[in-house]
Amino acid sequence: GYTFGNGDITGLRQHIGIVSSFITERLPQHMTAEKIVLTGKYKSSILYKAYGDKELQEAKDMLTSLGAGDLIGRKYRGLSQGEKQICLIARSLMEDPDIIILDEATVGLDLFAREKLLRQIDRITSLPHAPLVLYVTHPAEEITEKMDHILLLRQGKIVAQGPKNDIITPEVLADFYQNPVQIIPIDDHRFYINPLL
């Protein structure tokens, strides 16, 4: 284990993959999707190290494994927001991390791209030796079946945490939102939180 604040954070970086708009803004838009994915192998936004056909093939294979083989050869700047997010997820998986942090991963996506991305995230969590996925979001309807623990934060402080079924209750959510809410099922595993005004 690692205690936050103790030790060298450089070594810790090798165990964490991050998907964030902060990273998107720093990636070279002229590179192809597979080269963007390859930057994850080096934890860099540019390919400053020499790489060979083997490494590039790994990046292509990663895209293909996420059902995004059609992005190979396409320039990053020409991809839709959803396609860019898939590239970032593939990029975050390049070094087989222990943890993936997905920070507001669906911001800017249309309804269909959002659902496709959420399915990809569930697919990743189902893989053998899957990394722990830390999914940061505001819309509760993005919480999928595979997301089994919830941490509710308000102004940087923990309000509630625990198994999803213990946290997603009208009482806990009313305390969190400081207003009454109604939980409306979308399907067997997803829900929408409606504010009762």
Where are these regions (language model features)?
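ABC ATPase NBD Q-loop/coupling interface
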Residues: 1-11
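Conserved ABC ATPase "signature" region
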Residues: 38, 53-71
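Conserved ABC ATPase signature
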Residues: 75-79
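Catalytic Walker B motif of ABC-type/P-loop ATPase nucleotide-binding domains
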Residues: 100-104
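H-loop/switch region of ABC-family ATPase nucleotide-binding domains
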Residues: 137-138
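ABC ATPase nucleotide-binding domains
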Residues: 176-197
